[in-house]
């Protein structure tokens, strides 16, 4: 399941984070690449664990905790500390799959990457190219979102970033270990959650039918969750 989550960050918050990270030193993006990814990756990245990356990452994590759409879709158990990349001057990231296990440089965080997330920090009209292309069984999906919006997709997906031919594309990217590792099960729970919310608005949260459906949701989550 791919999901566009709008306005994870306000425009003012995006501007605040951009001022912070733009003033910080950047390094070769391959510092965090696996062997195969390093062959396809050309970009710059904020050093993992740097003061700017840590401060900006904490702001993003705070925003995610308050975002009900993200919580419902991802069912997050652990969110990897957000990283930051920048593409400019023809830089790109060829077709690849993210590593199945991610470990932070300090060794404090080690997760199974169930979901990948890209949070856009540049307005789409400010750069050419830089399209995130995610492949699944239905084909290739092109993603280029407003600053502050985020795309969430299975980490098992083949994906790439096309060359940036004008301007610079700055994003945050990170991975999520979900309480429910299988994408199909997560999607079913997400659809049930949305239906419960919509029905609650129409018939009332205390309607017997809704109480029964909510119980079914939690029993499925109980059956599938890994904690």
Curated annotation (Swiss-Prot):
GO terms for biological process: DNA damage response; intracellular iron ion homeostasis. It comes from Phenylobacterium zucineum (strain HLK1). 2-oxoglutarate binds at residue 169. InterPro entries: Oxoglu/Fe-dep_dioxygenase_dom (IPR005123), PKHD_C (IPR041097), PKHD_hydroxylase (IPR023550), Pro_4_hyd_alph (IPR006620), Pro_4_hyd_alph_FE2OG_OXY (IPR044862). Keywords: Dioxygenase, Iron, Metal-binding, Oxidoreductase, Vitamin C. Residues 78-178 form the Fe2OG dioxygenase domain. It holds the Pfam family 2OG-FeII_Oxy_3. This is PKHD-type hydroxylase PHZ_c0292. Fe cation binds at residues 96, 98, 159. Signal peptide: none annotated.
